Amino acid sequence: MATLTEDDVLEQLDAQDNLFSFMKTAHTILLQGIRQFLPSLFVDNDEEIVEYAVKPLLAQSGPLDDIDVALRLIYALGKMDKWLYADITHFSQFWHYLNEQDETPGFADDMTWDFISNVNSITRNAMLYDALKAMKFADFSVWSEARFSGMVKTALTLAVTTTLKELTP
């Protein structure tokens, strides 16, 4: 499995022109980051253990291929902070929600605002979050949906890259 560089992540996310494709790509990237992190959980990397126990667990059809199961394991073993666990879970849940919708909301919709208002890696960045809030609740003459959508996309991209940096073993 190839390791994604920050440039790869930025390129892939920037190429997405709507919220659905953005969240699908973000979900795939976060799952790949978790897959790359998982082997570091196993202390004894004896060849036999890796071959007969670790590899089957991490295989694409294995039990740890599910992002929610893998996250719970990482968190339960104390290898992930609560805020990070919450952010990745939140991304996963929002992606699953969008996947079930007939019409996907846009970057500037209230549903998306509710989502980003609960992403710790965005809300903990006071300058970014305050700028988003100011634009979201600004007088209409100042507010531009295209500008706000671009800013939301940037904030979500920063959240994904911040999360991936935390998943470095």
From Swiss-Prot:
One of its GO terms (molecular function) is fumarate hydratase activity. It is an enzyme of class 4 (lyase). InterPro entries: MtlR-like, MtlR-like_sf. It catalyses: (S)-malate = fumarate + H2O. It comes from the Bacteria. The keyword Nucleotide-binding does not apply. Its EC number is 4.2.1.2. Keywords: Lyase. Belongs to the MtlR/FumE family. In vitro catalyzes the addition of water to fumarate, forming malate. Cannot catalyze the reverse reaction. Cannot use the cis-isomer maleate as substrate. This is Fumarase E. It comes from Escherichia coli (strain K12).
